Amino acid sequence: MDKTYNPQDIEQSLYQGWEEKGYFKPSGQGVPYSIMIPPPNVTGSLHMGHAFQDTIMDTLTRFKRMQGNNTLWQVGTDHAGIATQMLVERKLHAEEGKTRHDLGREDFINKIWEWKKESGGTITKQLRRLGASVDWDRERFTMDDGLSEAVKEVFVRLHKENLIYRGKRLVNWDPKLHTAISDLEVENKDKQGHMWNLRYPLADGVKTQDGKDYIVVATTRPETMLGDSGVAVNPDDERYIDLIGKEILLPIVNRRIKIVADEHADKDKGTGCVKITPAHDFNDNEVGKRHKMPMINIFDKDAAILTQGETYSFDGKELEFDAPIPERLHGLDRFAARKAIVAEFEELGLLEKIEDHGLTVPYGDRSGVVIEPLLTDQWYVRVAPLAEPAKEAVKNGDIQFVPKQYENMYFSWMNDVQDWCISRQLWWGHRIPAWYDSEGNVFVGRDEAEVRRENNIADSVTLSQDEDVLDTWFSSALWTFSTQGWPANTDDLKTFHPSDVLVTGFDIIFFWVARMIMMTLHFIKDENGKPQVPFKTVYVTGLIRDDNGDKMSKSKGNVLDPLDMIDGIELEELVQKRTGNMMQPKLAAKIEKDTRKVFAGGIEAHGTDALRFTLAAMASTGRDINWDMNRLEGYRNFCNKLWNASRYVLMNTEEQDCGFATDAQKELSLADRWILGQFESTVKSYTEHLDNYRFDLAANTLYEFTWHQFCDWYLELTKPVLFKGNEAQQRGTRNTLITVLESLLRLMHPMMPYITETIWQRVAPLAGLETENTSIMVQAFPVYNAASVDAKAMDDLEWVKQFILAIRNIRGEMDISPSKPLSVLLANASSDDVRRIEENNSFLASLAKIEEFTMLENKDDAPACAASYVGNLEIMIPMAGLIDVEAELSRINKQLEKAEKGLAQVQNKLANEKFVNNAPEAVLAKENAKLAEFSDAKTKLLEQKAKIESL
């Protein structure tokens, strides 16, 4: 094996070999186990969230594969409607100076397919870099032929069951992209704005209790007053009780609107009077329905003012009454209209006052423009009938959330479901399978031929297909079963559905998880006709944040690319990556400064295994993770530790008799028996942690055993045997070295696939295992074997460790060289202590550098000593000639002074109220850690000083 571990030399060639040899495919043997990857956007590239979730999924997949399950990790990508269309539109404009309208729908869609063929595979290439053991031969795309058929089938069936309908309702409208968007694509931003207090004149000479002929409404959106249908007051608000049912003469448009009583108006907020605009506000829309108010749309698709308000009944039917808009406002952008309307109110003497006001403004996450609630004709799914079985599936335990607390989030959404708007005004996506005749009649079917056949429509009648496409989440909701061949009842569907676990983020529990549950329960039944769930467990991950706890985003310039941590990146390239193509270039200077400070030397290459192990080790259930480059560095060192330990094993076993192929006698040392027992305990804990989705505890278990038990202790304890033992003892230790390392590599493999495969290929033949044309990933996962745990050996070796540590502590405290042989005096020795010393003399002599043991009948006979204890056994080392007391006290005093100075500085900082109130949490945590460190150092140094002074 090479002297140093270099992941770049092994990773990519290994992966290619695994894929070519078909190791990722289901074996066809054993209990089925399946995971469906959340399909990443085809436009996307790997980010830390992907790396985190993919590490968890691959760990589970490899774990179950090695346990003998018939394992499928289903891979695929999402067509990502808006994201893909925008990307190709930008490319088209940059390269050819054209818009999609210049090309026309068909040619533009062909352009997107061309782009997908050329560039759409970026994320799948990156998935390979992570070591993802997905079955690439089964890769799906949400717009491939099979999935497109499934989407049409679901739409047609739901429509026949009256669960899909077309209606005029309020949606999040993006005036730049000209499409409805989902709540998830809306980014709410806190902004400083204004609250305009407007006077609305009362009609018919009506007066308020205090004699005014108007009431005052407060609004942050004066422009929408053109579409007002009423004013609401609280039914318990005595100021306005006499006005309920009376009318207002709406300024500028001179339209009469009613005053209604509704709980939506808060009598303690503002003036207590709320203008109601059902066509341009979601809350107002609900009030409007309750009072059967008309809906008056005042905006076109660009959010500019119409020439005439479009009027509809509260349930979306066209109305015949006029809602005129003054010509001077026609065609004005909504924000220009706002200024014009406020100016008119001021001119009319109807502007009461303007107040500064903080408000939350919805922006399109891709277009960056303010989203407008707009009345449009859209297709909807009736969610309520689908939601009840979906709630029951979680209540009765058919689906479990890990951590369980996310069930509450799920239920809070499911108890307040609204009908789902599934149409989008885009060209890229699943086109809605509905056709219209010239009179506007709508027909739904799988294709035009079916529509004509089922509705007896002659070929001479012109039909035109709906221009809209389906929400991307609609096809994603069918992911677990459409990927397995539905609507056909395929063997894959019977074998791998329901899937075992879904790994996802909390932010899409409603948008994706709940919809998958609803759709799957509705369409998929088992052999007994019982509705099937899409997955048995939902494992919910937190977000990965930067080291200060801030969300990673391009605008903050704190995004970390997983591949940069795997391969490394130079500082200049990193700066360019973080500051190039920014939406807000003015932030670039600060981002560059911060990047140069934090990553002065760029980012070193750490390899895939170190990244995966870090992600697993930080995966405490459901909590957000503050990324820590130091931990990544630490786990890169862990890979080195494993590599070097394996080299030690190979150097001491290759071309030696390791006792696997012969009947020659093997004698296991106490250390051999101990490490075998320790390994079994590790197998037990690690397996339990993975079964319970505690990847953090599983990683920690591996780390503790590998670094502290196997490397720090066992390898050291083998040296006396390998250098001085007889043949049987050496054979026993070599056999144990190989047995434990080979088994440990199999245990580690699910989390760290590359390094374990590389070492296993060298180690396994020494254990008599065949490695030609096979891989560690298809070997058996270690199973806990209680018979291999020798309790007496475990106790005895732990005692030996404590004894050695006691000697090392004395050396450390007294600054005695580790290589200096010592004489040891022992008092209060039990018969077990005596036995253990006699049986393990070679270990103690070698690892603690002890040349002589003396048992004392009376410890008062001992000269001046430094002492320590193992249980009741007192271990004493005579100090005469070992240390210079004065020099040692001088050294300790210097260290003490340094610790006290550091302690005082931190205490002063934490006593500063301004610092504590303004510092980020991560900074405070670091200061508190320093406080504990300096306090601890001071305590230990004072103890040390007292000991030396007592000599």
UniProtKB/Swiss-Prot annotation:
Where's the motif 'HIGH' region? 40-50
Q: Which Pfam families match?
A: Anticodon_1 (PF08264), tRNA-synt_1 (PF00133), Val_tRNA-synt_C (PF10458)
Motif interval(s): 'KMSKS' region: 551-555
The record's section on SUPFAM superfamilies has:
Anticodon-binding domain of a subclass of class I aminoacyl-tRNA synthetases, Nucleotidylyl transferase, tRNA-binding arm, ValRS/IleRS/LeuRS editing domain
Q: Which UniProt keywords are listed?
A: Aminoacyl-tRNA synthetase, ATP-binding, Coiled coil, Cytoplasm, Ligase, Nucleotide-binding, Protein biosynthesis
InterPro entries in UniProt: aa-tRNA-synth_I_CS, aa-tRNA-synth_Ia, Anticodon_Ia_Val, M/V/L/I-tRNA-synth_anticd-bd, Rossmann-like_a/b/a_fold, tRNA-bd_arm, tRNAsynth_Ia_anticodon-bd, Val-tRNA_synth_C_sf
Give the reactions, separated by semicolons, that this protein catalyses.
tRNA(Val) + L-valine + ATP = L-valyl-tRNA(Val) + AMP + diphosphate
Q: Which GO terms describe its molecular function?
A: aminoacyl-tRNA deacylase activity; ATP binding; valine-tRNA ligase activity
Q: What class of enzyme is it?
A: ligase
Highest taxon listed in the record's lineage: Bacteria
GO BP terms in the entry = valyl-tRNA aminoacylation
Where in this chain does the entry annotate a coiled-coil region? 879-950
Gene Ontology cellular-component terms listed: cytosol
EC number(s) per entry: 6.1.1.9
Q: Where does ATP bind?
A: 554
Compartments (UniProt record): Cytoplasm
Q: Which family does it belong to?
A: Belongs to the class-I aminoacyl-tRNA synthetase family. ValS type 1 subfamily.
Q: How does it assemble?
A: Monomer.
How does the entry describe the domains? ValRS has two distinct active sites: one for aminoacylation and one for editing. The misactivated threonine is translocated from the active site to the editing site.
Q: What does this protein do?
A: Catalyzes the attachment of valine to tRNA(Val). As ValRS can inadvertently accommodate and process structurally similar amino acids such as threonine, to avoid such errors, it has a 'posttransfer' editing activity that hydrolyzes mischarged Thr-tRNA(Val) in a tRNA-dependent manner.
Q: What is this protein called?
A: Valine--tRNA ligase
Gene designation = valS
